C-alpha cells in the first residue's frame, strides 16, 4: 500500500502559540509550519513557506504513484483556497481516495470541494478501519474507487 500524505503534530513550548509541523508519510520529512513572531504577537504564526514545501512533497508522492492520500485536515486555509489545497486537488485529479479531517466550521467549503464524492466517517478507530478495509477489498479485486458508481473517493473524519 503506497501512502502519500501529511500528519500534523504540535509541540508545547514556552510561547503561548504551539510549534507545529507536518510530517510526510512517504519519506518522513518534517516541515515546520509555524514561525516565531516574537513576544506578545497575536498574529497567526502559520509559516506559508513550510506549508508550501509540505504540499509540494505530497504532490510529488502522488506523481510517483500512491494508492491512498492521508492529509491532516481540510481547514481554514484550504477553505480559502490555500494551505494544502493543491495536494487535495492532486489527489482528486489522480482519482485517489483521500482520508482527512474537517472542522464543522468549514464543512460547507469541504462539501463544495469534494461534492458528492465525500462521505463522513465518525472519528473513531472502528469506523476508520472499516473504511480502510472496504477500500483495500476493492483494490484486491481490481476495482478503483472511481469505477464504482456512487462510491466516495474522499472520506471525511468529522469531530
PLM regions and their residue ranges:
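A charged, well-structured terminal subsegment
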Residues: 123-159
Amino acid at each position: 500500500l503506497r501512502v502519500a500524505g501529511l500528519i500534523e503534530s504540535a509541540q508545547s513550548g514556552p510561547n503561548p502559540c504551539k510549534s507545529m509541523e507536518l510530517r510526510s508519510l512517504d519519506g518522513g520529512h518534517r516541515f515546520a509550519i509555524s514561525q516565531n513572531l516574537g513576544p506578545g504577537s497575536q498574529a497567526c504564526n502559520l509559516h506559508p513557506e513550510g506549508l508550501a514545501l509540505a504540499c509540494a512533497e505530497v504532490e510529488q508522492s502522488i506523481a510517483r504513484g500512491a494508492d491512498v492520500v492521508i492529509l491532516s485536515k481540510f481547514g481554514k486555509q484550504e477553505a480559502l483556497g490555500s494551505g494544502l489545497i493543491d495536494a487535495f486537488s492532486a489527489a482528486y485529479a489522480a482519482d485517489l481516495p483521500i482520508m482527512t479531517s474537517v472542522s464543522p466550521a468549514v464543512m460547507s467549503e469541504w462539501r463544495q470541494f469534494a461534492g458528492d464524492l465525500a462521505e463522513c466517517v465518525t472519528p473513531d478507530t472502528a469506523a476508520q478501519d472499516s473504511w480502510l478495509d472496504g477500500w483495500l477489498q476493492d483494490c484486491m479485486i481490481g476495482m478503483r474507487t472511481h469505477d464504482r458508481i456512487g462510491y466516495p473517493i474522499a472520506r471525511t473524519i468529522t469531530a
